[in-house]
Amino acid sequence: MGALRPTLLPPSLPLLLLLMLGMGCWAREVLVPEGPLYRVAGTAVSISCNVTGYEGPAQQNFEWFLYRPEAPDTALGIVSTKDTQFSYAVFKSRVVAGEVQVQRLQGDAVVLKIARLQAQDAGIYECHTPSTDTRYLGSYSGKVELRVLPDVLQVSAAPPGPRGRQAPTSPPRMTVHEGQELALGCLARTSTQKHTHLAVSFGRSVPEAPVGRSTLQEVVGIRSDLAVEAGAPYAERLAAGELRLGKEGTDRYRMVVGGAQAGDAGTYHCTAAEWIQDPDGSWAQIAEKRAVLAHVDVQTLSSQLAVTVGPGERRIGPGEPLELLCNVSGALPPAGRHAAYSVGWEMAPAGAPGPGRLVAQLDTEGVGSLGPGYEGRHIAMEKVASRTYRLRLEAARPGDAGTYRCLAKAYVRGSGTRLREAASARSRPLPVHVREEGVVLEAVAWLAGGTVYRGETASLLCNISVRGGPPGLRLAASWWVERPEDGELSSVPAQLVGGVGQDGVAELGVRPGGGPVSVELVGPRSHRLRLHSLGPEDEGVYHCAPSAWVQHADYSWYQAGSARSGPVTVYPYMHALDTLFVPLLVGTGVALVTGATVLGTITCCFMKRLRKR
């Protein structure tokens, strides 16, 4: 026997296997979704179909057939991309009307669309692709089962009353105040035998606008995965807790919009969508229904807030009490959880522009405060009725005369305790006249002795005369100085040196020379200022400023008048002998001549000043 040798394949066999393998990789394949698919009667359905591994032109043709359960072997032509006469009679009218159509996505992919499913549309759908290949290899059609479910989704407005009451047949019209809560309920249920999820959302359309996807603005909704999501304009309010959505029981959903705003007005709808999970794991919406919940009007505070004042123009005397009443009116929500109010009084002097300055106010918590310049006075601001506020000045002054206005502000509460001003209103002006005290003051001041020298004490006297005024008038006097700079008075305001108040208490300011100062009352209407150890820095123009004060019944003081004396010049002279010691460093003889010259000059100047005076 000869040795065994391995059997060699013919050279053409490996090549043939490779060709067969390559042809298998390029075999035609038609792909449709995995079934069965569940859809609801009356809704739209889309079934995709695409082909791969084909030969021939890039644009392939597609034909759709239906095999009904009662005739599983009978193919009913639905629609074709090639033949317009392809449809069987049962589909012809629907195809012509566009209710059933095939839409090409690209050359090798299409989608079958049925606008409104009917119960007889259930069955096996086949997508067939006529061959354009050189050899018949692969699959030329794909099949998927479609099951049509009855429409059992129900959506309606939830009745505001207890369970069991029927919702009204027509949508109600609701009116809420700005800042109040807007609460709406929706009933959504389904009895589909398959496992489905409901997504429920609340939407709003502007008043009188037609309802549609383009006009309906989503407020908030619960998705099919139970996540709560708000529409873009409401996302911030949802995050802040002003917007809430919850499920009560098995089929009731409740939306609460806290702190209603003017932009919340409109027609509210509830939309329920039923979702099912297809065999490929994706979720598909199989039904959707919408119900009108209510037509909502938001009554803004700015359109309702009104302020009136009384009792009318007032004329009173100084020291008399002044009472003014302010009434806040309008269809307003009560102060509390959703709304808050503040009320204040403003006063502007007669003829002054603008509302003026704040006198007193009650804030949103009912805490009173006085405006700048009114501290220390007996002024009361109180609430005397549900919407009536009273301002009382225990003792009016002439400076209280002017135009009074009452200012009311309305606030709404946002999330937590945050307040947002929603409206404000001012009353008409209320004139108040206060008689003047009729006090006339005059003051005469002079330097005692006429001439003062350095190191001495300068005494300045001020006599005050008074005409008119009530009994018990008190006088006060203060001394002021203006310093010269380069021979002229400085533009700096006068500086207080000292004075005696209406209560007899002395007040000391700052003396230019820094030495001791004394102020005293030397007579009923005579005041004296003394500058001890006078120095060159004390040079200046002094004046006396008296003022008249009246104490009212509330023990507050009111300045009833003031005056200013004429200027008093204080010039500290040097003693003549002091000048002899200045030039000793340059010789005694020169000092005597210089001293005599200076002495003569000073004496001459002094005599000239006396003659001028």
From Swiss-Prot:
Gene3D superfamilies according to UniProt: Immunoglobulins
Lipidated residue numbers (S-palmitoyl cysteine): 604-605
GO biological process: cell motility; nervous system development; positive regulation of cell migration; single fertilization; skeletal muscle tissue development
PROSITE patterns: IG_LIKE (PS50835)
Record's signal peptide: 1-27
Residues carrying covalently attached carbohydrate according to the record: 50, 327, 463
Expression sites (tissue/organ): Expressed in brain, kidney, testis, liver and placenta with moderate expression in all other tissues. Detected on a majority of B-cells, T-cells, and natural killer cells. Expressed on dendritic cells.
Main location: membrane
Protein's UniProt keywords contain Iron-sulfur: no
Gene Ontology terms for molecular function: signaling receptor activity
Record's comment describing the protein's domains: The Ig-like C2-type domains 3 and 4 are required for interaction with CD81.
Subunit note: Interacts directly with CD82, CD81/tetraspanin-28 and CD9/tetraspanin-29. Also interacts with integrin alpha-3/beta-1 and integrin alpha-4/beta-1. Interacts with HSPA8; this interaction modulates migratory and antigen-presenting capacities of dendritic cells.
Protein name: Immunoglobulin superfamily member 8
Species for this entry: Homo sapiens
